[in-house]
Amino acid sequence: MLCCAPVSIRAQVITPAQIFVVHGTPRDCTSITQLDSALSDNYQPFFAGWSEQDYVEAIAWSRACANFGWHVTGRSRIPLLQAQHDKAIGPVPAHVGTPAGGTSNPMPMRVSPDIALSGEPPSRAPLKLPADGSPVIGSDTTIASHYQDTLFDIARRYGLGGEEIIRANPGVDIWLPGEGTRILIPGRRILPPVSREGIVVNLPEHRLYYFPKPAKNETPVVITYPVSVGKDGDSTPLGQTRIIAKIQHPSWVPTQSIRDDHAARGDPLPRLIGPGPDNPIGDYKMRLGFGGGMYEIHGTNAPATVGMAATYGCIGMYPEDLAALYALISIGTPVRLINVPIKVAWSAGTLLVEAHLAIDAHGRAAAPSFDQLADVLHDSAQHARVSILWERAVYVLERADGVIATVGKGV
């Protein structure tokens, strides 16, 4: 059975003289492999400082760090990484943030692996489908960040994916947006141009839509969640299928190709990972009919990968989102996986466009082409008199940030 835990995003081997401090003992670590090795030897870090800006971003995505459940605490220029489950770790040293003899360069803040969610954020609440048949749902909002937030923290809190919030907020520091920074929460969406039943996953959008069957005299609703999809070379299949099985507390049996891939990166996997916090597919999974059940909708123990192309072909979800969806879904629920990078809609006499990065047959992402945009706009406008703002349309295409914009008006 193919199952697809998030793929670690790893930095290149970096320059020497970076110090990994473990129980007060310096240890040189010049690559992710060495860091993973240190973890596998049961070292637990007081703190770590790196001179390479991207390095902590890389380890935040690594399987080893996710399994150890590191959190950022403190407000030092180099934030503290503390292994919370290790009772042997005593009080934080006074010099935390700048290892003795190490670098004092600023370091990106690492994403917290679990975020306490209070209430039901608007992006996760069921949304009534417009009575007039319009495909436009939801609304955009703006919030002010707190000093300890990362964009990944905010994304998870508001039902967004990582890439979604990053592209919607260009110029905002991913790891340290700062106190009071205005953050756009893109909640206004154009529904995918397919039948509104069951589960629909739009791969370029990294988003799942669930259309529950309404009871008699009940207003139809949609519930939408961010998802991770297949990475470059391991694309998620397209087409129609159904949920053929639901499994709670699953074990993970990685295929030989997945094990070979991890081994080549110095991250060997066992043949079986049982249920629990170390299981990369989480506490629930729903098997799809593709390829004899080879693909699944499952959870993750690396939530920062949600909303990105990061799996071996499956659909990954935040644990709390999958738990909610799992309770709503029955075996036999139809599932449609589509590749629609550009969505259009008419609303109040204006032509709206929502553009995302296109995904090719191999899972590679790129800006959608002008021809794709022109075809979609032509199809939408052919039965109406409309003035298209082409410069605006091209700008929206180039940004491909998923934020709805007006590109035309009726005349």
Regions found by a protein language model. Name each.
Residues 258-411:
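Exported/periplasmic cell-wall-interacting domains
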Residues 43-53, 66-75:
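Charged, low-complexity interaction regions
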Residues 123-159:
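Primarily a LysM-type cell-wall glycan-binding module
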Residues 148, 178-183, 332-335:
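Loop/turn positions that initiate beta-strands
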Residues 94-99, 105-115, 121-129, 170-172, ...:
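Intrinsically disordered, low-complexity
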